[in-house]
């Protein structure tokens, strides 16, 4: 389906209903940004544009669905869904710690008193960037962030 002036929006819901594995990724050589947060934002925008163009017949994706495509969906497409892409027993621990307060805040919209976890997560995805990522873990090892150079069981 073409949205607007020739922009293509994939029929993701149709793919998923048919059992086609769908992952969300980024290729800075073929896009505007290498940021997965930006890829998630663009996926939300494109899916909602598709909903408008289809007059509501093809519902836009939710933030939770887009997050799933960016994590477990990508792992499943690569045949790695049993090892990575979500938290679980015997899975590799890949994670980020997001800073939402003070100097760690980056450009993220201010977290307000009373914001639940869902609201904070949405603010991070929609307005955050790498400056909000205060720690990054890959395969259980701290690869970026506070404590990386300290002698700890996690980061060393």
Cite the ranges covered by each PLM segment:
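C-terminal cap of metal-dependent C-N hydrolases
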Residues: 92-151
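Long, low-complexity intrinsically disordered regions
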Residues: 65, 153-156
């Amino acid at each position: 389906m073409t949205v607007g002036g020739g922009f293509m929006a994939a029929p993701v819901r149709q793919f998923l209903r048919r059992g086609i594995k769908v992952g969300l990724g980024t290729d800075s050589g073929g896009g505007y940004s290498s940021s997965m947060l930006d890829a998630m934002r663009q996926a939300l925008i494109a899916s909602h544009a598709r909903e408008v163009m289809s007059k509501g017949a093809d519902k836009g994706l939710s933030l939770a669905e887009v997050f799933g495509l960016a994590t477990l969906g990508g792992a499943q497409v690569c045949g790695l869904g049993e090892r990575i892409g979500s938290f679980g027993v015997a899975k590799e621990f890949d994670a980020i710690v997001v800073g939402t307060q003070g100097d760690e805040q980056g450009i993220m919209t201010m977290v307000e008193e009373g914001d639940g976890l869902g609201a904070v997560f949405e603010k991070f995805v929609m307005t955050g960037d790498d400056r909000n990522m205060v720690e990054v873990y890959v395969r259980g090892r701290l690869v970026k962030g506070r404590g990386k150079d300290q002698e700890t069981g996690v980061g060393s």
